[in-house]
């Protein structure tokens, strides 16, 4: 039996896409102990912003960060002031509320809320135009992404079953290209 030292457990990785069109939310999460790889990644990302991508701590309101401390990392640089406001406003509020929902539901334990760190990579479309929908979609997406990470989803059977017909909201290959029928 192999015992993993405290803080060196494997981080939970989750993903979820909620909504459609320009107000959809796509979130990726990494949750792990602050003293482990997730904590190192969290601190490194906060300390090393890049042009247009400035990670920040998600707050429920000013000076009240959500727990576990959540680093909001944008997947797209703010295209203009209105896009930036959607990132900093409704998307951040949705992420913070969704993380708190995950703690309230027990998906993240109360103990882990003080010992773990969460990284949330968040997509807000530069053409998004409905603040309330951005909020709702991000709240649901992060809560579901955290639950998916806790459940080690997706199931490998589902991944292998979908490999012949990949698609996403931005592209679906033609049937003759999607299914290569290579059985490797």
Predicted regions and their residues:
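Accessory interaction regions appended to the cores of large information-processing enzymes
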Residues: 1-184
């Amino acid at each position: 039996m192999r015992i993993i030292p405290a803080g060196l457990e494997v981080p939970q990785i989750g993903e979820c896409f909620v909504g459609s069109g320009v107000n959809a939310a796509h979130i990726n999460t990494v949750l792990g102990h602050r003293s482990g790889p997730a904590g190192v990644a969290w601190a490194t990302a906060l300390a090393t912003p890049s042009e247009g991508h400035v990670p920040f701590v998600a707050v429920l309101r000013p000076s009240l960060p959500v727990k576990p401390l959540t680093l909001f990392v944008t997947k797209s640089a703010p295209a203009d002031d209105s896009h930036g406001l959607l990132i900093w406003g409704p998307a951040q509020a949705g992420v913070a509320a969704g993380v708190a929902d995950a703690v309230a539901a027990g998906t993240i334990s109360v103990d882990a809320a003080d010992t773990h760190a969460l990284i949330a990579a968040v997509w807000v479309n530069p053409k998004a135009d409905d603040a309330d929908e951005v909020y709702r979609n991000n709240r649901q997406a992060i809560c579901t992404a955290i639950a998916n990470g806790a459940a080690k989803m997706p199931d490998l059977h589902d991944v292998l079953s979908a490999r012949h017909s990949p698609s996403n909201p931005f592209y679906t290959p033609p049937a003759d290209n999607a299914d290569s029928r290579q059985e490797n």
